[in-house]
């Protein structure tokens, strides 16, 4: 295997050969390089270009297939596939490849032009309207912004941000520049910045629907559902029959808890776009959240019947914990997984769905293989580094030493309303939330992002700054600022509450911010939902999360995260003695009554029988565990990880001494 610098040196030699049209010489060098660096996608891409110019079309397609196996969303590989098929006069395959290329990367002008030309040549000009509109928008954009779109599509976010900021300094009111910078901010987790940019964009250009839709999506991510719904209503009023606008409104209605309206609108869309797979899948999500599992299954299956490569629908079926795939469905999923043209995202969905399918069949080796593949796909797209979070946790402990905590015992907002349930995902937090929210004095909400958003705001300091100011900057905050942050949290979260005096925030990752919570909300209750490390970590590893939780994409990564979590919780116990109630999942399963009374006593609540029969709730539940918590206490999952123990040595080794706290 060559070093990266050696590969780059060969490519630097080859590029002038390509520009000079010396394709045979270039091909020879690139074939050798492809043997020495078989997974270098840029080298393979240049080889495929050479092969096309040499009319070695079959060889070019083989080379492009190699790229797509390594990187399924390599947009230029799909575009080059289109060029090859077009040279072979296979216009149908060419059209599909060009379409896939622009789905991944909207900046590929030649793929847009090629689609329009093919459709016109094959007497299908009625399908060119949207493509011509997209091309006109792209041609009208300043070249730097086209470059930004291209970099975003390649996940080169730092370069994209630098280029976009440089452009915006010269053109501060360019709406598309604002929209793209907001898109980068959203991907980097800077939701405050993204919201500000998009709010400004729609002020300058109220009729810019792309900016408004992006604004709605950011509002949803920040769980400002009321404003997101209002914006969706404004969008719909512009064109009530537009299925895209209807879909946005339906999704925001669902997020706001109005599932009847959402389902009604989804049905209206299906009258315009019969059996649209995306709409059917969203409809299935709404039905699932309402507890209508059978109807959800039907909706997901209809989506698959319409579009067999729709991986999200398959995974949505797998995520219905009480659902089992038929043999025919498993065969169909494997066939789609083997298809080269399928998107990276669909492949990921299919791998996790196949893992669940084979686990249900007790074929654990095969199940693990698919879980591992699914995580590998996610890992490729992730920039997560365990060392960065380890350092952040250590910084929390360094700032919140005993002296600092002693100086800040009387700070913050005195409201006792919040009950934080923290820990790792898949640790039983949904179970604890359902128990507590069944009490008459407690409102259940969801995983609220407000504390994470505050931490992110403190971390970034200036807008889109790359310098971290959290937690190191906390000692500089005044008592007034700390109180205001607490009051802001109470105010912002009120939209999710009913009339009960207490409410739950079950965002698991808030354990990282127990110090901050104690500074701004000293009377809040904090419950640490803990589960056996092997069970918790493997359950996270086999779960495909909608977003975030990047530490779950590898056994070593999730083991490191769990170990660091335990170490940080030990520190919080030391500096805030008695502040956090630890609830062990296995103990809740073994003795529900005792643990429920213990939890209620900690929260200062009288015992209510409804907390024991929590599974009778009619409330919408928005987590992967939603089917489980509608059943009496879920005992079968306590030792599921042992079915996979033969494959979990890397996890055991990473957890190290943490495992010694638990019986084997």
Model-derived regions, located:
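Register position in tetratricopeptide repeats
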Residues: 19, 53, 87, 121, ...
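Structural marker of alpha-solenoid helical repeat scaffolds
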Residues: 36, 70, 104, 137-138, ...
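PAPS-dependent sulfotransferase catalytic domain
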Residues: 256, 290, 445, 449-479, ...
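PAPS-dependent sulfotransferase catalytic core
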Residues: 363-365, 369-485, 630, 634
């Amino acid at each position: 295997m060559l070093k990266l610098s050696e590969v780059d040196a060969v490519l630097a030699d080859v590029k002038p050969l390509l520009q000079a049209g010396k394709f045979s010489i270039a091909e020879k060098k690139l074939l050798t390089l492809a043997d020495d660096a078989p997974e270098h996608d840029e080298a393979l891409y240049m080889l495929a270009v050479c092969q096309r110019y040499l009319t070695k079309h079959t060889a070019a397609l083989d080379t492009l297939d190699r790229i797509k196996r390594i990187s399924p969303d390599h947009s230029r590989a799909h575009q080059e596939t289109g060029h090859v098929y077009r040279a072979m006069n296979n216009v149908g395959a060419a059209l599909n490849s060009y379409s896939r290329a622009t789905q991944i990367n909207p900046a590929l002008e030649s793929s847009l032009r090629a689609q329009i030309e093919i459709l016109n040549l094959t007497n299908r000009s009625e399908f060119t309207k949207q493509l011509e509109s997209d091309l006109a928008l792209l041609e009208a954009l300043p070249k730097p912004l086209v470059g930004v779109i291209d970099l975003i599509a390649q996940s080169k976010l730092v370069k994209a941000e630098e280029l976009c900021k440089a452009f915006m300094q010269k053109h501060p009111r360019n709406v598309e520049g604002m929209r793209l910078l907001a898109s980068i901010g959203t991907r980097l987790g800077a939701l405050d910045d993204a919201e500000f940019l998009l709010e400004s964009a729609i002020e300058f250009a109220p009729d810019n629907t792309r900016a408004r839709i992006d604004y709605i999506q950011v509002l949803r991510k920040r769980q400002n559902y009321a404003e997101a719904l209002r914006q969706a209503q404004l969008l719909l009023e512009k064109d009530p029959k537009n299925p895209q606008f209807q879909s946005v409104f339906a999704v925001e209605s669902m997020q706001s808890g109005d599932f009847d309206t959402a389902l009604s609108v989804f049905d209206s869309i299906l009258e315009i776009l019969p059996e649209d797979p995306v709409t059917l899948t969203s409809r299935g999500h709404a039905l699932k959240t309402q507890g209508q599992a059978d109807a959800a299954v039907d909706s997901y299956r209809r989506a698959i019947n319409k579009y067999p490569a729709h991986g999200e629908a398959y995974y949505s079926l797998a995520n219905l914990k009480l659902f089992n795939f038929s043999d025919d469905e498993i065969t169909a999923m494997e066939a789609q997984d083997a298809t080269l043209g399928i998107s990276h995202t669909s492949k990921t969905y299919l791998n996790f769905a196949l893992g669940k399918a084979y686990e249900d069949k007790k074929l654990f080796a095969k199940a693990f293989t698919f879980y591992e593949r699914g995580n590998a796909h996610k890992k490729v797209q992730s920039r997560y580094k365990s060392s960065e979070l380890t350092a952040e946790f250590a910084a929390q402990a360094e700032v919140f030493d005993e002296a600092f905590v002693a100086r800040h015992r009387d700070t913050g907002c005195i409201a006792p309303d919040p009950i934080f349930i923290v820990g790792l995902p898949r640790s039983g937090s949904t179970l604890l939330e359902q128990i507590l929210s069944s009490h008459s004095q407690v409102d259940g909400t969801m995983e609220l992002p407000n504390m994470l958003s505050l931490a992110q705001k403190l971390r970034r300091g200036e807008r889109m700054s790359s310098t971290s100011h959290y937690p190191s900057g906390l000692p500089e905050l005044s008592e007034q600022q700390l109180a205001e942050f607490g009051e802001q949290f109470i105010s912002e979260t009120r939209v999710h509450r009913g009339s009960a005096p207490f409410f739950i925030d079950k965002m698991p990752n808030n354990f990282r911010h127990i110090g901050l919570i104690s500074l701004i909300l000293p009377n809040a209750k904090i419950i640490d939902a803990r589960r056996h490390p092997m069970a918790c970590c493997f359950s996270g590893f086999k779960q495909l999360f909608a977003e975030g939780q990047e530490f779950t994409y590898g056994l070593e990564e999730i083991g490191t995260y769990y170990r660091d979590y335990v170490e940080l919780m030990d520190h919080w116990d030391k500096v805030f003695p008695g502040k956090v109630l630890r609830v062990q999942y296995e103990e809740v399963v073994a003795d529900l009554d005792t643990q429920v009374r213990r939890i209620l006593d900690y929260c200062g609540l009288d015992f209510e029988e409804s907390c024991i029969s929590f599974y009778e709730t009619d409330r919408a539940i928005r987590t992967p565990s939603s089917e489980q918590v509608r059943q009496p206490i879920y005992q079968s999952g306590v030792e599921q990880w042992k079915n996979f123990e033969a494959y979990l040595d890397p996890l055991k080794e990473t957890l190290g001494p943490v495992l010694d706290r638990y019986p084997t």
